[in-house]
Structure formats: structure tokens, C-alpha cells
Amino acid sequence: MPPPRSAGVLLFRQQTGELQVLLVKPGGPFWRNRDVGAWMIPKGMIEPGEAPAEAALREFEEETGTRLTDVPFPLATVRQAGGKMVEAFAVEGDLDPSTITSIEFEVEWPPKSGRRQKFPEVEQARWMTLAEAREYMLASQLPLLDALENILPEISRGGGSAKR
């Protein structure tokens, strides 16, 4: 059986001459007390019959409340620790991280309590320089930063179009 597949967007911008990427911190109790190594790209499962780029844009909107209208540029595919494959796409754009809104998921919490609680899929978003991202990003997604640096000259500078 092939590993599960997901897709996501690495949103980037040039700010005062420095490349920055938008990363998100997942919500919920598992991630509550984690910071270093907990940040990642907005991503989620590819639905049956859905193209990876479409899934990446859909998941970005679900997890940030922001619709991207630019065509995503294929970036890289990475394998996460649990075996899930993540197809990542790069999009140049800008958004205010304080305005994100995320869909929620439900989980039994505390474990074995019989109580179900809802948590946002994304608790927080933050623009980071590549150096900051290398410190805070989930280890399995770090190759995405190198891939972005390598393909940056190929990506059109048409400007981002992140829209709420």
C-alpha cells in the first residue's frame, strides 16, 4: 500500500531584501508546549481525484482562511517521519499572520476521558527568515527551504496574490 499523500504551500516574500517564508504551528494539545521543530507549511491530505496543486491551494485556504490565486510552482516532495509524503508548492505572496482563521478538528481530550474537544488545525502563523525557519521548522520539511532557494530564480516575480 502506498504511503498517504498530502500537499501544501510554502508562501514566500521578499521583505527588506530578505527572503521570508510563512510557516504555521499546528493547534491542539500535542503541539501546545512545542515551538522549536514544530512549525510547518500549511498542508493536508490530497482527496481522491484531486490534483496535488489543487489540494495544496485548498489546504492553504482551509488552514489560513486565505485564498491564493497564483498558480503554485512545484517545489519538492518530502517524506515525513510517519511515512506520509508531502508534495510542496511555492507561491510568492503576502498576508498578515494575525488575520489567519483555521478550520477545526475534534479529538478526545484528555485521552480516555470520553470528552471530545475542538481545536484549530493551525494555532499560529509567522513570517520567518530562512535562518529562523531552519531553527523552528519540522525537520522533515527542512529540505523545502533549500528547494526554494534553488528554484527562486525560475519563479516569476509577478507578485503575490493572497486574498481573504
Stretch-by-stretch model annotation:
Residues 16-18, 28-31, 47, 82-83, ...:
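Short, charged/polar surface micro-motifs in flexible loops or helix N-caps
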Residues 77-114, 126-128, 148, 154:
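Active-site-adjacent beta-strand/loop module that shapes the phosphate/pyrophosphate-binding cleft
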Residues 130-164:
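Charged phosphate-binding loop/patch that engages nucleotide di/tri-phosphates or the phosphate backbone
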